[in-house]
Amino acid sequence: LCRTEHMFFEGDRIKAVREMILADDEAGRRVALAKLLPMQRSDFEGLFKAMQGHPVTVRLLDPPLHEFVPHFEKEQRELAKDMNVPYEKIAAKVELLAEVNPMLGHRGCRLGNTYPEITEMQTRAIIEAAMNVKKTGIPVHVEIMVPLVGNHKELRYQKNIIDQTAEKVFSERNDRLEYMVGTMIEVPRAAVTAHQI
């Protein structure tokens, strides 16, 4: 199981993640996500090569966005300076992202459903990486896990985004690749409705 959020905390990556979080609109988020795409693709290529044909389950972004932003004023001021935005904007966004119950809040598939461009970027990175590695003669078995699904509609919505994005990549490259999409039953609602999921 590859938890993709751990890839986001290093150097330039955390900066791009924070740019995405602080973006005012989808266009701004897409600009930041475009910076993350080659980093994610490279990570997945390394992973698929190392696994030498063994199945790899890649879990899409799971934690709430507040985990990626600084919570103390000093660090928020440093971030504001680094990003050339007013400190007040950073402080307001951090306050807006605060979760009462971060274990069940705006995270997992709900984050991907609110911001489908995140799911699109991660799917593109996974599929492109798998196809690149496959071209070298190494078999690749990709399993994409949608996190924190509570009902079948959430999974269906995310699967549609994943499938549409994969089809775009297949069309661009005039090649195809088998992959699976699934979830983990990890919340009570998912257990109760598992027969639908």
Give residue ranges: language-model regions.
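Conserved alpha/beta-domain cores
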Residues: L1-I197
